[in-house]
Amino acid sequence: MSRFVFILLCFIPYLGRADCWDKAGERYNIPSSLLKAIAEKESGFNKFAVNVNNNGSKDYGIMQINDFHSKRLREMGYSEEMLISHPCLSVHYAAKLLNEFMMMYGRGWEAVGAYNAGTSPKKKKERLKYAEDIYRRYLRIAAESKQNNRRI
């Protein structure tokens, strides 16, 4: 059932960024401002971003999903190209990954750091450095969002 809901949510037409961020955040109980902070850091909100890492792996789309997830994506009926052509899919998949890291580490900043640095015990310093950057971005984006809501 969970897989069906994930697939259904990802194929809802991309009606606008706000709708996509909010739906992914609601689905996985993650603030949409946090997802936006990650997208800003990872791709600068560039849905066409493709980056090659030092180890030769590639990251795709607005949320820079690593090709480590290729097999899992294919099992779900997706491809790396779809992460680029359907930015909402990228956002939902990133929220799903972040939720999985939160199950491992708890709903804290180390889970956010694992999104980028992975789960190796040797990478704890990198996780915390990444999380600090995301935290600053998150605070700014959340404050901007709150201010925009007041104007309505």
From Swiss-Prot:
It comes from the Bacteria. Pfam families: SLT. It comes from Shigella sonnei. This is Protein IpgF. The keyword Acyltransferase does not apply. Belongs to the IagB/IpgF/P19 family. Keywords: Plasmid, Signal, Virulence. InterPro entries: Lysozyme-like_dom_sf, Transglycosylase_SLT_dom_1. Residues 1-17 form the signal peptide.
